[in-house]
Curated annotation (Swiss-Prot):
Glycosylation sites: N75, N85, N93, N132, N148, N162, N189, N231, N248
Membrane topology: Single-pass type I membrane protein
Residue span, Protein kinase domain: 314-596
Topology, Cytoplasmic side: 278-620
Region (Disordered): 586-620
Keywords of this entry: ATP-binding, Glycoprotein, Kinase, Membrane, Nucleotide-binding, Receptor, Serine/threonine-protein kinase, Signal, Transferase, Transmembrane, Transmembrane helix
Stated name of the protein: LEAF RUST 10 DISEASE-RESISTANCE LOCUS RECEPTOR-LIKE PROTEIN KINASE-like 2.3
InterPro entries, per database record: Kinase-like_dom_sf, LRK10/LRL21-25-like, Prot_kinase_dom, Protein_kinase_ATP_BS, Ser-Thr/Tyr_kinase_cat_dom, Ser/Thr_kinase_AS, WAK_GUB
Lineage start: Eukaryota, Viridiplantae, Streptophyta, Embryophyta, Tracheophyta
Domain of life (superkingdom): Eukaryota
GO CC terms, sorted: membrane
Active-site residues, as the UniProt record annotates them: D431
Length: 620
């Protein structure tokens, strides 16, 4: 708790420092600085403010497309539009009217760029009717043209009001001139055209209609507003005031308000980011502290580093099992004891599974529960060390005699009874199957693989799970659908019942298939129950059993059928199962017929929680 409190204090301190910095951050420049940056553009007879900028008037003082250039020493003003330079002959600030002429037409016509230059319709509008004239050049010298001219490089040309000569000339471009300057005849005199082009065009800036008043600065001087473009729905310039004469080089500025709003919003965003990071880091710290506390509670259980794990397994040379969570290797401790080492896959998602398994196994001490000897928890490297059992897993020994299978089934029942009732905290295994039952040298069973186990208090009869866990064919119905009942320790009882029935059914699988070849893939508890009703156990048990073996086999069948009842409330608890297995056959009542329309499943296929084992030795 002290570390968490310290972290909270550090977070609060950082938050206060951040607020202090934002509070003292200069929001806007001084009035003198604003006047210096946005003083009017002056060149020759032209003095303008917004929306123009250029020279010593900064770019953010006007529209980005309206940059003016002062050409010295002639003190003439130019404006670049769509890549072509225009001479600005005059600007009327009150009416927002400009007189523009193409600079390349200011000299001899033959020196022009001979390209069309339509003005941008989003910035300008024509004030009077205009007409486009077509200039053809590089024409056929053998033909006669109206309004013809000759340029040294361009060759023979013609200026007309239509496209008459388009097929007779290689090149053409258009120029725009006022209609009043165009004569009635079709062809134009080149000298007359040069004069018209030098006089230029009159255009009006596209400013919104909200005008008619002067803006006033805080010191009472009349001037221009810098942030004139507001609420622009399209590309047009939109102003809240008219472009009027500028006095004293100052202007009214709403920038302080905008910058203040931006600063406040930025501060809020930064604070939110800081709080999120603090919360995230705090959650990670708490989770890590909880894991460490959980592992520290393991007491005398020895921890190993990853280097020691490699040495124990001789660099992971001998694989004895594979599973969904990791790989099991054979190893040997320094004292000579053989061990099995399960190395979990590098994954962020299996930390909880690792903690579950280590915590569950560390609480157990029973002859029918595999013994945990140590663990490794080094960053993303995690491993579990437990006793090595020579005879591997039960799925490789299902053909044993009935007496041995009965002893194994009873041992598994005692192990599960211990997990449910003998530990300080109840442990529900959730993955009972032949691959997770290991056999020692005396064929004594030991329940293994606690990767899906869940710990709960004994008074908790109902468990909450967010996923389906276990192996298909052994998973209790309530884990698939809550319509069958609540998930509890009775889910292990169902898996145990399927395990016991498989031990009996697998022993004579070939005989069953030969007896009914058309139904060999049927859900095997179905035909077990039918044989039980008909008092015919021949195809299941076979011949040559002693009376004691036959009693034990029938007892296993009855107990198994009791355990696989679909409703958890109809299943016996594990301590009752042990009592039934140890008692006499005559004391067992026939079980109700279970729901027998379970779809055919592959018993080796697993749910998303696990992958198929491919070994003679199951992972623990």
């Amino acid at each position: 708790m002290d570390s968490l409190s310290s972290m909270g204090f550090q977070t609060a301190s950082f938050f206060l420092i951040l607020l202090f910095l934002f509070y003292h951050l200069p929001c806007v420049p001084s009035q003198q600085e604003r006047s210096r940056l946005c003083k009017p553009f002056q060149c020759g007879d032209i003095t303008v403010g917004f929306p123009f900028w250029g020279e010593n008037r900064q770019s953010d003082c006007g529209h980005f497309s309206l940059k003016l250039n002062c050409n010295k020493p002639s003190n003439t003003t130019s404006l670049t539009i769509s890549g072509h330079n225009y001479s600005v002959l005059h600007i009327d600030n009150k009416s927002n009217i400009l007189s523009l002429s193409r600079q390349d037409f200011s000299g001899p016509f033959c020196s022009a760029s001979f390209s069309s230059t339509p003005l941008r319709s989003d910035l300008f509008q024509n004030l009077q009717p205009y007409r486009n004239l077509t200039v053809f050049y590089m024409c056929d010298p053998r033909r006669h043209f109206f309004g013809n001219f000759t340029c040294p490089v361009k060759g023979l040309g013609s200026v007309v009001q239509n496209s008459t000569y388009r097929k007779l000339c290689d090149k053409s471009f258009s120029v725009t001139v006022p209609t009043s300057y165009v004569p009635e005849e079709e062809a134009l005199n080149l000298t007359h055209l040069e004069s018209v082009l030098r006089k230029g065009l009159e255009v009006k800036l596209k400013i919104s209609e909200m005008s008619g008043q002067e803006c006033v600065t805080t010191d009472g001087n009349s001037g221009f507003t810098r942030f004139c473009c507001t609420n622009v729905s399209g590309p047009e310039i939109s102003c809240l005031t008219s472009i009027t004469t500028m006095n004293n080089g100052t202007y009214s500025d709403n920038r302080p308000f905008l910058v203040t709003i931006g600063t406040v919003l930025g501060s809020i965003l930064c604070v939110c980011v800081v709080l999120f990071l603090a919360f995230y880091l705090n959650e990670r710290r708490i989770a890590k502290a909880a894991r460490i506390q959980h592992l520290e509670a393991l007491g005398t259980l020895r921890g190993y580093n990853y280097k020691q794990i490699k040495k124990i397994t001789k660099s992971f040379t001998e694989v004895v099992g594979r599973g969904g969570f990791g790989t099991v290797y054979r190893g040997r401790l320094r004292d000579g004891r053989k061990v099995a080492v399960k190395v979990l896959k590098d994954s962020k998602g299996n930390c909880e599974d690792f903690i579950n398994e280590v915590a569950s196994m560390s609480q157990t001490s029973h002859v029918n529960i595999v013994t945990l000897l140590g663990f490794c928890y080094e960053g993303s490297k995690r491993a579990i060390i437990y006793e090595f059992l020579e005879n591997g897993s039960l799925d490789q020994s299902l053909n044993l005699d009935v007496s041995t299978l009965y002893g194994i089934a009873l041992g598994v029942a005692r192990g599960l009874e211990y997990l449910h009732y003998g530990c300080k905290t109840r442990i529900v295994h959730f993955d009972i199957k032949p691959q997770n039952v290991l056999l020692d040298e005396n064929l004594r069973p030991k329940v293994a693989d606690f990767g899906l186990a869940k710990l709960c208090e004994k008074q908790e009869s109902i468990l909450s799970l967010l996923d389906t866990r276990g192996t298909i064919g052994y998973i209790a119905p309530e884990l698939f659908s809550r319509m069958y009942g609540s998930v509890s320790h009775k889910s292990d009882v169902y898996s145990y019942g399927m395990l016991v029935l498989e031990m009996i059914g697998a022993r004579n699988k070939e005989r069953v298939q030969n007896a009914d070849p058309n139904n060999s893939s049927a859900y095997f508890p179905d035909w077990i129950y039918k044989d039980l009703e008909n008092f015919d156990n021949t195809r299941l048990l076979g011949d040559g059993l002693t009376r004691e073996e036959e009693k034990n086999a029938k007892k296993m069948i009855l107990v198994g059928l009791w355990c696989i009842q679909f409703r958890p409330s109809d299943r016996p608890s594990m301590n009752k199962v042990v009592e039934m297995m140890e008692g006499s056959l005559d004391s067992l009542d026939p079980p109700p017929k279970p729901l027998l329309h379970m779809p055919m499943q592959n018993n080796n296929a697993e749910s998303s929680q696990l992958s198929v084992e491919s070994s003679i030795y199951s992972e623990v």
